[in-house]
Amino acid sequence: MMGTRGLLVCAALAASLVSGAAEIVRVLGLDAARPYERGFTRDGDEIVVDNGDDAARRAGAVWSLALNQTEARPFTVRTEARCERGPGGTRTRAFSLYVDLVYMDGDHLWGQTADFAPDPQRGWRAGTVTVIPAKPVRSASVYCLYRGLPGRVRFRAPAVRILEQADLALFDAQPVALGDLPRHEAGFLVRDVQRADDGYAPIPVGGEAKGVRLSVVETPAADGATYRVTVEDRTGRDRALTLVYAWPLPAGDLVFEEDPRTAVPLADNAPQRSDAQAMGCGAGGLNRWPFGAVSVGGRGFALGIDTAHPAYFRTAVHPRTRLLFIAFDLGLAPEKRTAAFAFRRFTFTGGFRGALAAYAAREPDAFKTRVPEQGIWMPFRAIKSVENWQDFGFKFKEGNDETAWDDAHGIFTFRYTEPTTWWLSMDKAHGTNRFTMADCLAKVESLAAKGDLRARAWRGSVMRDEDGARVGRVMDTPWCRGAIWLLSPLPDIAGICEYKVKNTEADFAKFYAKPFPVGQDGEYIDSAEGYLTPTLDFNRAVFAASDTPLVFSSDEDHRPALFKGLSMYEYVRRTAARVWPRGRFVMANGVPGRWPWLPAYVDVGGTETQWIDEEGRWRPESHRSLLYKRALSMGKPYCYLQNVDFEKFAYADMENFMRHCVAYGLFPGCFSHNASEGHYFTRPEVYNRDRPLFKKYVPLCKMLSEAGWRPVNTLVASTDARVFVEQFGARYVTVFNSARATVKVRLTAKVGARASEHVEGGEVSFADGVATLELAPDAVRVLDFNLNTPVPR
């Protein structure tokens, strides 16, 4: 795997890493700060944000920075903050350093944060946001925020540090002195992240470096291999490491395969290119896709995770050294001295789509479609209560309150759980008086003393922050006035824990007593990416219960911790392992999302969304995001719920939403403006208004999704990049005009091909291999190359 020559040249790479790279420090002066919403006051060199007793007040300060980067370079934003008076609790985005980016190409990245605790006992704390941009940045907006909480907080010493030394390149965000580094054999490098001046060192398989031992089992496969990796600490202390596997690329024109519609040619001196997204932990971001791919002269090379054995990872291509690499951020601790995971190396042809097809062939279980029928998602509401419910295409029911009726009418019923959360309502004795986290803690301890299972699970599972405090916060929502406690979802925590209380053996035996399809059809996992859950859990008592590797914090200490994305993966994987043998399914809200390993264990994905803003202006999801969700779902159903004000979401908006769904074979659905009240399907005046749209478009979504999306379109090509074409099964193609104007597009297909069109009707002929369609903005067409099939209605 790595010969002597490889070790020698990797040593050259390691030696080329430099410390003390030149930085420009920009102090964010208070005179340049602008008010955010209700603003701030100044006390000397400090910013003061005082919300008083108003829990709805939003205030803070904001700076605008013009960066105008010619190449992507990392920078850090830092401030210090303390709470003088607040409700208590642990770190929250409501009290944070917050950074938004606008790239030079106009794209954006919102909401990278360093969070603080609204707890006066914490004193001054530093918060740092490390930005590792995927492409050059035009500008950044930096916020010091205190939103939706009572009390008063202070910020001081805000500053930005930017790497500006012209003769430096970056290798996985580490400065590298430019030079003609020779190409080398593939192999591993390791860096000790807790040492700021530490570079990469080669580490041989079966050998040691920087106090860790590396073991690798290689399983060759057609056009590639799978590597099972174990990293073991030999020092007995906390560790924060980045392990890199680097694969040299041959000579030739280099292309970064960014996504199914984007290929980026790279010059030999181009900066590193990656798909990683910021997660607020580790030494860098987390890959959005489960693999990274490049092409050289038309031949493809890719590295990706094994979804059965994931770790926190990113892939990147480094043109100056002609390396494709995969980097793993690994935490090790006395409580968990090893990290075990697996990744794949493979070749392909056909750009990103060919890479995705090749990856899916290596991960057949991850992309397997298990549900026999597909349709739209109904949250909570009894389907039988909807007038002429058959018109809407219901198939998946969130909530098991009418299982017998669902069985009789072909509806798949899912039991609701929400991992990581315990919504604790406070006693009515509190009335309208404000309560604190201390009050909520006292109630939990009282319940635990009485033997309450939820409280006992809290004792074994509650997450801990960097100070060892239990993670929770005061909440006032339509469904709970009290506190939310955040719990580890790991299924193998000893004793009573979150997973075992919410997923008892007795419940599974009862719900799945009879063979499918009789009874409950699966488990519904809400908030599967834990939108309220902190990124890291520092509870050392549960480190050993984790099967997946630890990661580490991105602050100055780089402490080992559990990453919620991997802990939630273990929850979902365990649930799938229990229901699949029973012929049942897993449905999850928020999947596919930001964690590329989670879709592998989800049979029905979906999300709650808003495609209009508060004023009712149309704000659709990007086509990049829509295609990402379809691609990682492959042939599995993906379902939407619009959570909007349905008086503002007009008939035309609903039709446009459904046309977008048809283009990608996704399922349109509706819920509530606040995910609780005013359920769409309790309101005949709105669902009857939209009934014709459901009857027209949902059968098309079903036809396409059940046929199965194909990453490689072999039927039709578009000559206009603004007109998207996607293939489903062997015979269907969707055509969508994303342009803001009507276009006449030339489509190419096999000479003599003919297709029926299922949206507006009629036939499309490719007599000479070309057909022309005139499409209005956001118009969709569905071509069916089997002319004998009637239009579904």
What are these regions (language model features)?
Residues 16, 22-212, 222-224, 235:
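Extracellular and organelle-lumenal recognition/adhesion modules and their flexible linkers in secreted
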Residues 61-63, 125-129, 324-326, 771, ...:
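Short strand-edge motifs at loop-to-beta-strand transitions and within beta-strands
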Residues 161-166, 182-439, 521-522, 531, ...:
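Carbohydrate-recognition beta-sandwich/jelly-roll modules
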Residues 334-344, 406, 564-746, 751, ...:
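Active-site-proximal substrate-binding groove within the catalytic cores of carbohydrate-active enzymes
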Residues 374-397, 477-514, 519, 553-568, ...:
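The substrate-binding groove and active-site-proximal loops of carbohydrate-active enzymes
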Residues 412-518:
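Active-site-adjacent "subsite" loops/lids of carbohydrate-active enzymes
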Residues 503-597:
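Active-site neighborhood of glycoside hydrolase catalytic domains
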Residues 767-793:
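C-terminal beta-strand-rich structural cap/linker in extracellular carbohydrate-active enzymes
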